[in-house]
Every structure is written in structure tokens, then in C-alpha cells.
Amino acid sequence: MLSLLLTTTVVSNETISKENLFDFLHSKQYLKTSFTQTTLVDLNERVVSGNIQASRSGNFKIEYLDPIQETISADKEFLYKLDTELEQLDIVPREEYFRNTPISILISNIENLKKLYSINSCIEENLITVCSLSTKDENSFVEKIFLQFVGTELDSLTYLDSFGQSVNFDFDNISWEPFSENQLYISIPEGIDVVYH
């Protein structure tokens, strides 16, 4: 479901605002973080943990670690989904697959961020800023996205979707430092079936 960092950066004493949110996000060309994902639907809660690495080049890798073991990766051409339990790697043409998904906030350049999202508000209280965004595409399953910052550190991303789900990613140990995009590739274990779609 849900990838960053390098050009200009928001100075640490500056606050995130409606006016500078996209500039701030675009300044983060790389992201590497662990997360806890909590999905709430009809009062049922599901919690999974994992890691995300993402780049504004549009590439990313999400590793779900507990309780499921699944890796999702994307380069410019394909989406790769490795399910070690099923011993299967699915390869799907990428096309516009992530255009209207929350991962686009972490992998899109500033021009695409402005095309995809409207910033409704950024409210700051006691060093915590919550920004509310809406997708501009009426056909998107995502209805609202909330980004929470502590100071200028991204603390969480929450989205509400048209299926009645609330999905929250709490981030831990965030790094905005550049990394080799080779880290975004999936290494395929022996005995895995590869399925092209």
C-alpha cells in the first residue's frame, strides 16, 4: 500500500505549514524507516510491522515482517510482490499503479505531488503538526491522508479509504540520508515461482 530527500531542506526551527509542505516533502529525496501499520475496519484491528525504503525517483521497497512476510518493490517498469509463504514472486507492469496510493507521497516529485493532492490544512500545536490532504482524482480509493510531524520529523501517515478502512503507519528510526537504489531490489530465494501478469 502503501516510498524522499536531497535538495533543499527545511531548517530545523522552521515549522511545517500548508505553504511549505510539498517543498518539504520534495526536499526529502530518500526515506528509510521502520513502521508499524495499524488497519482498522468495522472495529477490527490488524497490526503488522515492517520497513520502507523509498526514493523520489519513484522506486521503493516495503518489507512486511510480522506477522506476515511479504516484500513489495517497484522500479520504473514493474511492481514485484514476493510472498515467501506462498513461495511466489508476482511481477506486474507498473503503469499508473501507485498514482493514487499513499506511497505516492513518498515517491513523487513536487510537480506530481501538486497534481495529485490538495492540502486542506496544517495545524500545529505543541510542536506537533498534522497536515490533512485530499486526492484530486475522484476515482481514487483514498479519501483523506493525514501526515503527522513532530517538529519537522515525519511521525506518521494515516489514510481513510472508500472501503471504510483507517490505515495508520507509525514511523520509527527515520533516515533521510541517500542510499544506493540497489537496496530497493528484491533478492529472489531459491525455489520461488515467478509469475508474470
Segments and roles (model prediction):
Residues 36-40, 63-65, 82-84, 134-136, ...:
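A generic structural motif
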